[in-house]
């Protein structure tokens, strides 16, 4: 096991009716800006519940944050925060609203003579402070409710980049599985795929004898395999929804990634697909992951074989046959959830691969993976294999 420094300060209020504890998490004299997405939180009544919980407090609203939150939209919120002297941000939504609000939190406190896109260009390394934020989660997927990372898109340039800063980690997160009952099937399936790939990005790398992290990761994967399809078939099954919600949080709150090598190349290649073609984040992960594993099967051999045996119970055949079977089982799982796994399934013929590689190079993504050996040429082969 490698050395690590783990700090997970987000308070989790989990369960049915957990919103009852919301008010006491926010300073009583705060000027609160509630952020949300396209308006589903209004239709479902979640926003009304939040407003009721904060009755009598100084509250403003900012809606319209997109899936793959756009810098251009977020800068309008930054302007509002600065003008209205907002002191606390409250997310009501999923990972996109969370990521966007993390940017708002950091950008509002960023030096006014510097374009806040600099936050993305520097990966968040120069963030000195941020407006504190909390979350009422409505979509389990990204784990953004209890981590310090975010991914932001810039429409005008076709960029999608990530940043990380302890200053933007949510102070608390309210996780009520009931809020997920009304999610569209596509979002449920995407969330399961997202959590699954988050887990394997930290697990299917190379062995460092990190038994606890490995078995935590395997537990998350087995839970998603068992309950992901059930969440689609039984949308109001509380226990299923609770397990999927908690799995997504655990997949990316730092615990399973502590002291182990991490990959993240699937995400980096996927980000370029989203930025260029507008695919859902989880769709890009489902496209890239099987192709990447096949390409990197030799360097990932030990962990792919462990994954095959412990997650899919694949024990028969040669090493290569078991790896093939594990990759096929993973692809089949995504397909059964309704998330196709080839570029051609989305009407893409691969003609944009040179442009995708150019963007990877522009963003410095030329030595990806746990071994930093996924060069542009390897990325090209992965994209080609994903057609």
Protein language model regions, located:
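ATP/NTP phosphate-donor binding region
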Residues: 1-88, 343
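Short Gly/Thr/Asp-enriched flexible loops that form oxyanion-binding sites at enzyme active sites
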Residues: 77-78, 97-111, 146-149
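Short alpha-helical scaffolding segments that buttress acidic/His motifs in well-ordered protein cores
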Residues: 196-200, 241-252, 289, 330, ...
């Amino acid at each position: 096991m490698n050395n690590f420094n783990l700090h997970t300060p987000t308070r989790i209020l989990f369960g049915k009716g957990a919103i009852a504890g919301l008010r006491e998490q926010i300073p009583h004299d705060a000027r609160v800006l509630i952020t949300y997405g396209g308006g589903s939180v209004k239709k479902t009544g979640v926003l009304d519940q939040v407003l009721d919980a904060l009755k009598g407090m100084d509250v403003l609203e900012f809606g319209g944050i997109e899936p793959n939150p756009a810098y251009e939209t977020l800068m309008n919120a930054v302007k509002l925060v600065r003008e209205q002297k907002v002191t606390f941000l409250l997310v009501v939504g999923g990972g996109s609203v969370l990521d966007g609000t993390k940017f708002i939190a950091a950008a509002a406190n960023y030096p006014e003579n510097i374009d806040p896109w600099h936050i993305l260009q520097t990966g968040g390394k120069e963030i000195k402070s941020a407006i504190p934020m909390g979350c009422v989660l409505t979509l389990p997927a990204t784990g953004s409710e209890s981590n310090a990372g975010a991914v932001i898109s810039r429409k005008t340039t076709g960029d999608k980049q990530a940043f990380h800063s302890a200053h933007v980690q949510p102070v608390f997160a309210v996780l009520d599985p009931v809020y997920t009952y009304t999610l569209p099937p596509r979002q449920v399936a995407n969330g399961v795929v997202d959590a699954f790939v988050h887990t394997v990005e930290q697990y299917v790398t190379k062995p460092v004898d990190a038994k606890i992290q490995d078995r935590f990761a395997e537990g998350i994967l087995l839970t998603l395999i068992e309950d992901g399809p059930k969440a689609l078939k039984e949308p109001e099954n509380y226990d299923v929804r609770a397990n999927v919600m908690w799995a997504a949080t655990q997949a990316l709150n730092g615990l399973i990634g502590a002291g182990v090598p991490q990959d993240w190349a699937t995400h980096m290649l996927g980000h370029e697909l989203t930025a260029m073609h507008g695919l859902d984040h989880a769709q890009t992960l489902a496209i890239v992951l099987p192709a990447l594993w096949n390409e990197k099967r030799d360097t990932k051999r030990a962990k792919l074989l462990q994954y095959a045996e412990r997650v899919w119970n694949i024990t028969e055949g040669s090493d290569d046959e078991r790896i093939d079977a594990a990759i096929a089982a993973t692809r089949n799982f995504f397909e059964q959830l309704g998330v196709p796994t080839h570029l051609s399934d989305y009407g893409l013929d691969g003609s944009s691969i040179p442009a995708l590689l150019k963007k990877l190079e522009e963003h410095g993504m030329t030595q990806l993976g746990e071994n930093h050996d996924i060069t542009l040429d390897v990325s090209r082969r992965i994209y080609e294999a994903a057609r």
